[in-house]
């Protein structure tokens, strides 16, 4: 039987890595807000909303217009699009009564003071106690709980306290 477990580690990024993390937080917020605005405009014009697939395809076009989006982890941008799609899915299910639990409001724009975090995939724990995070390389971390052998890291959330 497979189990999902969560582990929380504190990381100690270098100055360079801190700058890249800040850029990633900002780019994730930009993608979320850009496509939230796009979805709202489509809703007002009674057009079909963009699927997660359509948004991910369009992120490539957006990267061609805004070259600095290429500096950050592309998976983080895709996860932002996925978060928006899930938020809309939960909202529409809530409105139609198909969602269990409390009613959910429509997705809201994120601001600079919102929780700064992003999700990514492809993270590894190295033997020397560092975390291998995409675009950040090896980041110093306090690995106080070892990850069991034969287990895989499905996704990782990086957040600023």
Q: Where does each model-flagged region fall?
A:
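Nucleic-acid substrate recognition interfaces
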Residues: 1-161
